[in-house]
């Protein structure tokens, strides 16, 4: 009998560890390249050949951010590819390559880039007018499609030499890559499509590209970073419990080797403020917390009215190395179909499945709170949401008032476990009794095991 108890307890222990391991990593899988809240979201690169030249062609390359709520912030996108033959870039407008490469074999006019694998970036605002084209020169920053389609497009023009001069002799580039600004995007092979049609400014004449191909790039949070980037905490007026972000949501504090986070009261705080003129990707340097996340979203159920209920949403930045410009928040909750008012955020419903309206995107008001400042006294933005009650569904029981899912800047945030949500007082007692019975059962098993 004793052997049976020992063996079974060992099996249950191993089984429990296995379940915990699987649950811990279930949130970060390669399948996250498909986003159920934005199933058709992608970045599409369209390459239009506009005219032929003596040894190649002139093309306009347009980058469309068709993602509803994932934008590209500074220092912006970097687009790369491999030439199929020995092509060179003679000149560019609206963008530039990051390296020229070895052009020593050329005499006279030197190409803009001779690399087999060029990387192109957008020009910065304020670039000379003779180097600009339409939709260029925003430093590679692209807004999300839901926030502002007009600024979700970027373009550059390049003159390609040592290439084909007909549709049959041109070879499409291969191995496209997109950094925005870091990793996370996987690009498809270029696909030749029907030539793009252009409508004239007077809308009376239509021209078309000589040849067009498209590249589609999709995002995976699993590829973008090893750990999550945000977490969610919860509270309510009907329960004193404040549910914090789960411990180690975005990594654990390294106590043996200090330096992976900053104590806000420590002497090092003044030295970590980044140089605002540095136009390069800077990894997060976060405030020392139990959750170790760069960003925390707090959802507080604030007031219960007769026909309405109110929520306060606070976004706090714990990252000393990042100001989040044009930030956005996506929230999934069944009562969004009855959202009545947002007090200091912009709001737009997201309905990837037309019959279901349970998801909304929130973002800051321009020049007021569209910039989430770096960690510190000004590193937060907040708003309140007013929902109308739906008699058939509304309840404060069993955590119904809390969101099902939250995204910050397109990344899925770590939610607290459902059994930790603030419960109504009359149901909290049942939870306590259940926990008491579980503890008593565990003590009984230990007692029996010790006496057998």
Curated annotation (Swiss-Prot):
It holds the Pfam family COBRA. A lipid is attached at residue 432 (GPI-anchor amidated serine). Keywords: Cell membrane, Glycoprotein, GPI-anchor, Lipoprotein, Membrane, Signal. Residues 433-452 form a propeptide. The keyword Glycoprotein applies. Glycans are attached at residues 42, 167, 175, 214, 239, 254, 323, 338, 357. The keyword Glycoprotein applies. It is a lipid-anchor; GPI-anchor. GO terms for biological process: cellulose microfibril organization. It is found in: Cell membrane. GO terms for cellular component: plasma membrane; side of membrane. Residues 1-33 form the signal peptide. Expressed in roots, stems, leaves, flowers and siliques. Belongs to the COBRA family. This is COBRA-like protein 1. The lineage of its organism: Eukaryota, Viridiplantae, Streptophyta, Embryophyta, Tracheophyta.
């Amino acid at each position: 009998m004793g052997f049976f108890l020992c063996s079974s307890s060992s099996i249950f222990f191993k089984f429990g560890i296995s379940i915990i391991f699987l649950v811990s990593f279930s949130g970060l899988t390669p399948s996250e390249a498909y986003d159920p809240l934005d199933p058709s979201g992608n970045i599409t690169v369209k390459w239009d050949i506009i005219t032929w030249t003596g040894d190649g062609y002139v093309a306009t390359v347009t980058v469309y951010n068709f993602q509803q709520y994932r934008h590209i912030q500074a220092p912006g996108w970097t687009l790369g590819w491999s030439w199929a033959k020995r092509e060179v870039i003679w000149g560019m407008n609206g963008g530039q390559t990051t390296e020229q490469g070895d052009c020593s074999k050329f005499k006279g006019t030197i190409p803009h880039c001779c690399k087999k694998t060029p990387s192109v970036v957008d020009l910065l605002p304020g670039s000379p007018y003779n180097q600009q084209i339409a939709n260029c020169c925003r430093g590679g920053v692209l807004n999300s499609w839901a926030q502002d389609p007009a600024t979700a497009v970027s373009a550059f023009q390049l003159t390609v030499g040592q290439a084909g001069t007909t549709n049959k002799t041109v070879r499409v580039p291969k191995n496209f890559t997109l950094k925005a600004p870091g990793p996370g995007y996987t690009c498809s092979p270029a696909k030749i499509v029907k030539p793009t049609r252009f409508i004239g400014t007077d809308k009376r004449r239509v021209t078309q590209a000589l040849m067009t191909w498209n590249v589609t790039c999709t995002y995976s949070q699993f590829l973008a970073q090893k750990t999550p980037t945000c977490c969610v905490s919860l509270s309510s007026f009907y329960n004193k419990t404040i549910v914090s972000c789960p411990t180690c949501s975005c990594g654990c504090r390294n106590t043996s080797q200090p330096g992976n986070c900053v104590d806000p009261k420590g002497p090092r705080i003044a030295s970590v403020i980044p140089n605002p003129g540095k136009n390069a990707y800077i990894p997060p340097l976060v405030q020392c917390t139990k959750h170790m996340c760069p960003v925390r979203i707090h959802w507080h159920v604030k007031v219960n009215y007769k026909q309405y209920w109110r929520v306060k949403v606070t976004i706090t930045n714990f990252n000393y190395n990042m100001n989040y410009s044009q930030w956005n928040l996506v929230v999934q909750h069944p009562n969004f179909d009855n959202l009545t008012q947002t007090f200091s955020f912009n709001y737009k419903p997201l309905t990837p499945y037309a019959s279901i309206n349970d998801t909304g995107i929130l973002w800051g008001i321009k020049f007021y709170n569209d910039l989430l400042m770096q960690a510190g006294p000004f590193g937060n933005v907040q708003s309140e949401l007013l929902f109308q009650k739906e008699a058939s569904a509304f309840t404060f029981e069993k955590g119904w008032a809390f969101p099902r899912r939250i995204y910050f800047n397109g990344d899925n945030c770590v939610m607290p476990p459902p059994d930790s949500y603030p419960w109504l007082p009359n149901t909290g007692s049942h939870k306590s009794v259940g926990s008491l019975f579980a503890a008593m059962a565990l003590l009984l098993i230990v007692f029996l095991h010790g006496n057998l």
